[in-house]
């Protein structure tokens, strides 16, 4: 059931992004923000490149964090991490009790994704997890009108849109995701690069 609820300006949001695919283990970084203005902490873990452990690793990282009790929302930069290690957002919501908002800069090319998944013996399972993430909604967060796309679990569309807009203060990407990306790439490459 997706709920809409009152959103405080300093709602605690955890944004998660992954690093570059350089090894079999891929670093994931989470940043804890109060709204879009204030970073309270950084979380780190590792997932398997092209594995199936992203949901479990992210859930464990969240539940073992000292920030867990204050967190109200988890934001993901897409549903695939470390190549095609797919996050089951419904399961992540059930495991953590925290609503999940997936943010994407571009609408996914499902044809290309399906083609890539044909190279995996369990490609059909991964495809089902991707489909299970639900309807993709278009959202404009900034004045220039550049849209982003979101999916959600455990939260109503109005609340999800409000939280994304509240936390998108520097660009059309929410600060928790933008900063997680900067940290993840900076640690791996010695300097941040690319866009969240």
Swiss-Prot record:
Gene3D superfamilies: archaeoglobus fulgidus dsm 4304 superfamily. It holds the Pfam family DUF99. Belongs to the UPF0215 family. This is UPF0215 protein MA_4269.
């Amino acid at each position: 059931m997706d709920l809409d609820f009152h959103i405080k300006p300093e709602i605690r949001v955890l944004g998660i992004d992954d690093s570059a695919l350089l090894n079999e283990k891929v670093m994931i970084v989470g940043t804890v923000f109060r709204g879009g203005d204030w970073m309270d902490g950084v979380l780190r873990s590792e997932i398997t490149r092209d594995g199936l452990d992203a949901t479990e690793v992210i859930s464990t990282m969240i539940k073992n964090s000292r920030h867990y009790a204050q967190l109200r929302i988890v934001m993901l930069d897409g549903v695939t991490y470390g190549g095609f290690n797919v996050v089951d957002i419904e399961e992540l919501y059930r495991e953590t009790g925290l609503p999940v908002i997936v943010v994407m800069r571009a609408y996914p090319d499902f044809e290309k994704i399906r083609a890539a998944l044909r190279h995996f013996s369990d490609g059909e399972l991964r495809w089902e997890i991707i489909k299970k993430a639900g309807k993709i909604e278009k959202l404009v967060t900034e004045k220039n009108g550049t849209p982003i796309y979101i999916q959600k679990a455990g939260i109503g569309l109005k609340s999800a849109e409000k939280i994304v807009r509240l936390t998108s203060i520097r660009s059309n990407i929410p600060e928790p995701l933008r900063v997680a990306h900067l940290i993840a790439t900076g640690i791996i490459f010695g300097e941040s690069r690319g866009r969240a």
